[in-house]
Regions:
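Positively charged n-region of N-terminal signal peptides that target proteins for export
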Residues: 1-6
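Well-ordered beta-sheet/strand-loop patches within structured domains
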Residues: 25-33, 103, 107-111, 130-136, ...
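Cationic-aromatic interfacial patches
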Residues: 23-129
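Bacterial N-terminal signal peptides
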Residues: 8-16
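Membrane-interface motif at the C-terminal end of an N-terminal transmembrane signal
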Residues: 19-20
Length: 432
């Protein structure tokens, strides 16, 4: 069903025709669809008040709009004065006035929510289209808001966003008000923008914060489990990326990267002999496939390997010494990045955990396996490289937060990858 012509026009006139805050970006809300979805939403409510069931809901939205600079948006491009006039008419006028105001507040709310949620260029690489945040849907946003215990609280606390976002926004407001810490203002604004790409809603997902070297597993919108991780060293950084964990490999081989075979493995062979390879479970292979042929290690010119003149493929057999541990979780990407178990548990006790070649080593891989594989049927076996497909892929976000909420306050972590200054330079300056 469609809105009556006058209400449809009100919605269309109330939502700015141009991009309200980011001149270079297209609107995240398709305006014809917005009009139709808002009309359908109010038809379903059969005349029941939404915004005007409580005065606090309208004031919560107006306050957000007035402070839209905290979202790096321009408040002057939202029709705040028009909304206040419509709200006044709704409270003292006819049922028609209230319907007009309900439609207008809904349209601006959907527009603002979409503007806030639109991702900024913070360097996240999406290796799976399914992991990319979807534009805000008017129908879904309004229905979720309508089921909240308090619409005012839903709006005020920006519950359509990941919890990191409103927490960083509030902290940013406090710093701007104090006016004495420009460094922290820049830090909070940058990490606020990094939070825009995080999942919204209640689906399961994995969030790795490389700056803090921690992993959180979210279920039903809350952290269900957390663990330490080891991430890439400064020269081989864990990238900011998002993908979908689609399968796990039990009893994996570790395919030694060619540069490590040259810089670490070959010198050990030259110093200790071929017994080093046997002792550590390494074998030279023809290729990386599961049907690869094992090549006698004595046939390799290890001096040439160490000198970088010969490239050799080496894998480590499954077992207690294997660098991958007992399981690795795969989200297909061209960078060769994944989550995996590790036998090197002592590293998790260190405060700074940047020791990997880019992949994410897990403190408790068994716990993550239970969380994401759940009831997936598996056969107990010691066979190498058992692939187990997930019945439902799980989004994974490798993020980089040098400021984030924890225990009711904003904590900071060292910028171990020296990304903050570079990333901040690509973003617009937060308005004050």
């Amino acid at each position: 069903m469609k809105l009556p012509a006058r209400l449809a026009l009100m919605v269309a006139l109330t939502v700015p025709a141009g991009e309200p805050a980011l001149a270079a970006a297209s609107s995240s809300v398709q305006r014809p669809a917005t009009v139709s979805e808002i009309g359908q939403f109010f038809n379903e409510r059969q005349g029941r008040a939404f915004w005007f069931a409580s005065d606090h809901a309208t004031e919560s939205l107006l306050e957000l709009l007035e402070q839209a600079s905290l979202d790096d948006l321009d408040p002057s491009l939202y029709p705040i004065a028009t909304l206040r006039r419509l709200a006044m008419n709704a409270r003292s006028g006819s049922a028609r006035d209230r319907r007009d105001a309900e439609a207008a507040f809904s349209a601006v709310f959907v527009q603002y929510a979409g503007d806030v949620a639109r991702e900024r260029n913070v360097g996240t690489l999406y290796v799976d289209p399914a992991a990319r945040p979807r534009p805000v849907s008017a129908a879904r946003l309004l229905r979720v808001a309508a089921t909240a215990p308090s619409l005012a609280a839903f709006v005020e606390q920006m519950r359509w966003m990941h919890p990191y976002y409103p927490a960083l926004r509030r902290a940013l407001a406090g710093e701007i008000k104090s006016g004495n810490q420009p460094r922290r203002v820049r830090l909070l604004a940058l990490n606020r923008d990094r939070a825009r790409v995080l999942p919204r809603g209640t689906s399961d997902y994995i969030l790795v914060n490389s700056a803090a070297a921690r992993l959180d597993f979210y279920a039903d919108g809350k952290v269900k489990d957390t663990m330490r991780v080891v991430v890439g060293e400064a020269a081989q950084q864990t990238p900011m990326m998002a993908g979908m964990v689609r399968y796990a490999i039990l009893n994996p081989y570790w395919h030694v990267p060619p540069d490590l075979a040259q810089s670490r493995l070959a010198p050990r062979v030259l110093g200790e002999g071929l017994i080093y390879l046997r002792k550590k479970g390494y074998e030279v292979v023809s290729d990386w496939s599961r049907t690869a042929t094992v090549i006698p290690a004595e046939s390799i010119d290890w001096k040439a390997v160490a000198a970088g003149k010969v490239e050799v493929k080496v894998r480590q057999r499954p077992g207690p010494l294997n660098g991958m541990g007992e399981v690795k979780f795969m989200f297909p990407n061209d960078l060769g990045i994944y989550l995996h178990d590790t036998p090197s548990k002592a590293l998790f006790q260190k405060s700074e955990r940047t020791f990997s070649a880019g992949c994410v080593r897990l403190e408790d891989a068994e716990a993550l396996k239970r969380l994401i594989l759940g009831d997936t049927p598996m056969t107990a076996s010691t066979q190498p490289e058992q692939s187990v497909s997930l019945s439902r892929p799980v989004p994974v976000f490798l993020a980089y937060f040098t400021a984030f909420p924890q225990g009711g306050k904003i904590v900071e972590r060292p910028d171990v990858y020296k990304r903050d200054a570079k990333d901040a330079a690509t973003l617009s300056v937060t308005r004050s």
